[in-house]
Amino acid sequence: MIVLRSRSPRRKYVLESLDLDFRIEPEDIDESSLKNEHPLEYLKRICLSKLGTRSKDEFLISCDTIVVQENSILQKPKNFLEAVEMLERLSGKTHKVASGLGIYYKGLERFAFEFSQVHFRSWNHKQIREYVEKYSPFDKAGSYGVQDKEGPVRSFDGSYTNILGFPIRTFFQYHEFWKKYLKGN
């Protein structure tokens, strides 16, 4: 059985849509960034840390998603004001989303990631506040969800599931590790 080290309902949804046999056992870690830490170094450190306690008999996966604008990491907002500030910073601009995948299987540890580009609508302060009030994006990097119908995303280049928080193309590269966990096998 696959062990997903995440509480994200979006990651759970992606694995369910693949019809995989898995259970959820999140690992609580400190997700603070280190001083002068490059976004991809941060992503790798967090993904591998989330793998947590390891047993050779388990197939563990962890993910983390970051929004990167002007080489700065935008994580999950801590409160309403921070969510509004992030969205104002992103409004009318293009930024990158990186989702990382940590894998532990039979003593092997792997890390890989995907980048996507997201193009935001130009929103005024009122539109941003209304969005935050309606969607409460406090569990999402960058303070938004690509899946939100009335959200700030105008368009994107790359993988929808990557922006959602699960780098599915990268996950498929490791299919030899997880294909035996497909339901019905």
Curated annotation (Swiss-Prot):
Transmembrane segments: none annotated. The lineage of its organism: Bacteria, Pseudomonadati, Spirochaetota, Spirochaetia, Leptospirales. Keywords: Cytoplasm, Hydrolase, Nucleotide metabolism. GO terms for biological process: nucleotide metabolic process. Its EC number is 3.6.1.9. The keyword Glycoprotein does not apply. Its main location: cytoplasm. It is an enzyme of class 3 (hydrolase). This is dTTP/UTP pyrophosphatase. Its cofactor is a divalent metal cation. GO terms for cellular component: cytoplasm. Belongs to the Maf family. YhdE subfamily. The active site is at residue 64. Pfam families: Maf. Nucleoside triphosphate pyrophosphatase that hydrolyzes dTTP and UTP. May have a dual role in cell division arrest and in preventing the incorporation of modified nucleotides into cellular nucleic acids. SUPFAM superfamilies: ITPase-like (SSF52972).
